[in-house]
Structures are given as structure tokens and as C-alpha cells.
Swiss-Prot record:
Entries under PANTHER family matching the protein: REGULATORY PROTEIN SSL2874-RELATED, REGULATORY PROTEIN TM_1690-RELATED
Protein origin, superkingdom: Bacteria
UniProt cross-references to InterPro entries, sorted A to Z: RemA-like
The protein, known as: Putative regulatory protein CLH_1161
Family: Belongs to the RemA family.
Coiled-coil blocks: none
């Protein structure tokens, strides 16, 4: 099992092995998680000033803001896993 990298928009890449959740930023609990991460210094803003469309939570409690849709990030993750599985066979 190697390192899998996922593009989260604008050339920003995160390790797929570290992802815990990819969620929409619209709900109050997620907004609270974003604010708490900002206060702790654990927020990474990868939106380049654009609207936040996906919030990525990692196993190290970092919260990453992305300007691409959660479905797009999830699709990139599943596509990457399929390609790796085909190479392993």
C-alpha cells in the first residue's frame, strides 16, 4: 500500500490515507468545527479566496477547506483507488 494523493483543487494535494471525512460546509456543526480548528491553528484554507464547498477532516484533526464540491473530491478518491487496484492485479 503506497501513498495515495488527491487533488483538492488549484494544485493542492492531500494524502488520501489521512482523510477521515469530506463534508459540506453548510451545517452549523461543521461551521463550528471550522471555527474551532481556526482557533486551534489547525485550519488549512486551500480555497484561494473562493467560496468553500468542501470541508476535509483528517486523522490528525486538521480541517482543510476546499473550493471543489465534496462529490468531486470523493470521485477523485474512488477513481484513484480503482486505478491502484488495477495496477496491483
Amino acid at each position: 500500500m503506497g501513498i495515495k494523493l488527491i487533488n483538492i483543487g488549484f494544485g493542492n494535494i492531500v494524502s488520501a490515507n489521512r482523510l477521515v471525512a469530506i463534508v459540506s460546509p453548510e451545517s452549523a456543526p461543521i461551521k463550528r468545527i471550522i471555527q474551532e480548528a481556526r482557533d486551534r491553528g489547525m485550519l488549512i484554507d486551500a480555497t484561494y479566496g473562493r467560496r468553500t464547498r468542501a470541508v476535509i477532516i483528517t486523522d490528525s484533526d486538521h480541517v482543510i477547506l476546499s473550493a471543489v464540491q465534496p462529490e468531486t473530491v470523493a470521485h477523485r478518491l474512488s477513481t484513484k483507488e480503482e486505478v491502484v487496484d488495477e495496477v496491483d492485479e
